[in-house]
Amino acid sequence: MASKPDDDGFLAPYVSRSDAQRPLSIVSSRMTDIASEDGDGPEVQNNRLSIPQSTDMGSRPDTARTGASSSRGPWQSQSLRNKTYLAGVQAKRGSVESSTAGSTSQPPSLSSRSHVPSLQSHAFFRPMSSQKLQAQRGGSHRPSTMSQMSAAASPSSPTSPTSPTSPRSDEHGESSSSQMRQSIISNPIAQLQRQMSNEENMRPPPSRGTEMTEQETLDRITANTSPSHGHYPAGSLTDSVRPLQGMSSDTGHFQHSIIVDKSYKDLSNLPSPIKTPRSFRSSFLMPGRSNDGQLSQNRSTEGAEKLSSAASSPQFRPVDSHNEQQHPRVPYKPSQKSDLGRVHQYFDGNTVFCLGGRWQNTRGRPINIATGIFVVVPCALFFGFEAPWLWNNVSPAIPIVFAYLAYICFSSFIHASVTDPGILPRNLHQFPPVDDDDDPLQLSPPTTDWALIKSAESTTAAMEVPVKHCRTCNIWRPPRAHHCRLCDNCIETHDHHCVWLNNCVGKRNYRYFFTFVTSATVLAAYLIATSLTQILLYRNRQGISFGQAVDHFRVPFALVFLGFITFLYPAALMGYHIFLMARGETTREYMNSHKFAKKERFRAFSQASVFKNFIVVLCRPRQPTYYQFKAHYHEGDQRLGIRRDKRPRSSSQGLEMHDVNPGSSGFQGPVSLRNDTPH
């Protein structure tokens, strides 16, 4: 049946009348679910009822647009479609029940099963989600397919109400077959299952509104080498689609239903995954055994952090309500591991810790103890021999000020000596290990690079500073960071290693170091002033000579010389670091700059202002440590090494104290012959 083309319809496709089986159309399975909502007149409905129903699957009926255009003009159909579209938009703004009711009001027609439906359908403007589509299918009567219409028109069962292909109605007037898809032939997967299985109880084809419409999912379904009616895609359905694949207890057929009960615990419909040719083995990426029977690793795990994981998921089994009562579930309690110690016990640097990792110092000669003695002894002599006389004869403010300066000096000394100067974490940028088969003449990876630093000076916009890779710490050091050979650590913004503190001076303790040097200088000058004041006041009040006054106050006179000695070195350090801070440089940067000519010396980190340089150094926030030495150790931390008490101890004796095995005797030429020759 053909229709002439007009402005409002499409040409009817050419229909082959041969008996040869045509290939399946996947497009039809996607497009036939969209019901046409054009307003059809009475004459169009009569034309639909008068269409002969043929059982030939190779033929294809005319589309609704072609049939409608042959019976009515373009202007009439255009006005009817506009009215229908306005009515459809109002119905779309309602709930799902409104759309369901609208779909059940029209009888089954060929327009709802055409390959080219109405272009003004609701589905093109407001497509449904997979959940709403499943709900609509479960509650509405789906239109019959061509196979059902052919079976209904066949003379074998013209009046059979219980035909296998005819829908069965319950007492509420709803079709029970709407929960199962009737269009088996429109889906190629279902047809394949129908051809390979003769049973009627077969799983319904996957929904068109779910992820099964994707091509890659279709490939996963057909990947099994031995498909059967019980085959299902292993692990390809999402959790929102799995509850839809259920079996009805009344009919014994698979049906689509939405289970919204939160207490759903029946796992009988969730079988275990089936192994396919594309499945990975259970020991994938796990260390296996080599030919000699020893464990071998397919990748290096050195420096890797071991993450905790839960046990493997067991296979799903049917859960019975009686079994749940007999065997109640026990809440899972993670196993508590024994205390592995603190972080500082696994640290690889040349650092000694005390007070649980709160204090740290370089493992070497404790010269800082002598520095502390030089601070404590003069202060103790002052409070023992000068403070009482000054408190009673001059003013109590003098001993109080001295006590405050002594507190600042000693406190800053402790902080600068036992504080983390800014130790950078280790083993963050490890180079790949060198194999024995590698070419020894091959160039190694570069260990130097350049970093671009924005300059605050108006003459230059940016400057490049060198950065290096530390082979000892296995990290790329940031700008201004250096490795200290005494501490055996990379220090951030490293200034120098102070032997008087027995610790490095870096970004985290530079402020304490400068405070200690400055307060020690001021304290030494204050000690000299108070000692001389006490001697001179006693001489004037007693009317005696200076020698007699010194003979009366011998300790204050000794403190004058001690204060002068302790004043020189701290004063020099204080002036030097004031000069460095004003320039925006560190001690290491200033020393290295003298390797170049004056024209090539640049200060990349200067703020172009003396005041700003002081603010940046002295008023910057003190960042936390990278290691947290007081924290508990977690197994697999790549920054740390072996625990100190479990490390192999190196012998303190030299090589000459051990027995040296003689080398293998071989041909040594004339020397051996000359030694054996008798003289």
From Swiss-Prot:
Recorded superkingdom: Eukaryota
PTM description: Autopalmitoylated.
Membrane topology classification: Multi-pass membrane protein
E.C. designation(s): 2.3.1.225
Residue ranges annotated as Lumenal topological domain: 390-393, 533-554
Cellular component annotations (GO), alphabetically ordered: endoplasmic reticulum membrane; Golgi apparatus
Cysteine pairings via disulfide bonds: none
Catalytic activity from the UniProt record: L-cysteinyl-[protein] + hexadecanoyl-CoA = S-hexadecanoyl-L-cysteinyl-[protein] + CoA
Biased composition (Polar residues): 44-57, 66-82, 291-301
Entry's localization field: Endoplasmic reticulum membrane
Keyword field: Acyltransferase, Endoplasmic reticulum, Lipoprotein, Membrane, Palmitate, Transferase, Transmembrane, Transmembrane helix
DHHC domain: residues covered: 468-518
Low complexity composition bias: residue spans: 103-114, 143-167
Cytoplasmic side: 1-368, 415-511, 576-679
TM regions (residue ranges): 369-389, 394-414, 512-532, 555-575
GO BP of this protein: protein targeting to membrane
Active site: C498
Molecular function GO labels: protein-cysteine S-palmitoyltransferase activity
Region (Disordered) residue spans: 1-181, 194-250, 267-338, 640-679
Described function: Palmitoyltransferase specific for Ras proteins.
Record family assignment: Belongs to the DHHC palmitoyltransferase family. ERF2/ZDHHC9 subfamily.
Domain commentary: The DHHC domain is required for palmitoyltransferase activity.
Name of this protein: Palmitoyltransferase ERF2
Annotated source species: Gibberella zeae (strain ATCC MYA-4620 / CBS 123657 / FGSC 9075 / NRRL 31084 / PH-1)
